[in-house]
C-alpha cells in the first residue's frame, strides 16, 4: 500500500472519529495545529489506525521524543509523515 492509499484510509478514520470534514484533511494537515484534534480523539484515531493496519503505533515513545525535544511535532503529527511512519511499521511487521 503506497502513502496515498495509506493517507486515504487515515483521513477516513480521522473524519469518522473526530467529525472533521474529509475534504479539509490533506497530507500537509497537522493533526493538532491544523485539524484541532484533541488528545482524546487522537488516542481513538491511533487505536483505529492500529486496528485497520494491524500495527502498534508507539505513541508513548513518540510523545516522549517530542517532549524531550528530540523531534518536532511535525515529524509524527503532519499526516504525510504519520502515513510514512505507518508504512514503516507495516513493513517492519512483514
From Swiss-Prot:
4'-phosphopantetheine is transferred from CoA to a specific serine of apo-ACP by AcpS. This modification is essential for activity because fatty acids are bound in thioester linkage to the sulfhydryl of the prosthetic group. One of its GO terms (molecular function) is acyl carrier activity. Pathway: Glycolipid biosynthesis; KDO(2)-lipid A biosynthesis. Pfam families: PP-binding (PF00550). Residues 4-90 form the Carrier domain. One of its GO terms (biological process) is lipid A biosynthetic process. Keywords: Cytoplasm, Fatty acid biosynthesis, Fatty acid metabolism, Lipid A biosynthesis, Lipid biosynthesis, Lipid metabolism, Phosphopantetheine, Phosphoprotein. Its main location: cytoplasm. It is found in: Cytoplasm. The modification O-(pantetheine 4'-phosphoryl)serine is found at residue 39. GO terms for cellular component: cytosol; membrane. Carrier of the growing fatty acid chain in fatty acid biosynthesis. Is involved in the transfer of long hydroxylated fatty acids to lipid A. PANTHER family: ACYL CARRIER PROTEIN, CARRIER DOMAIN-CONTAINING PROTEIN. NCBIfam families: PRK06508.1. This is Acyl carrier protein AcpXL.
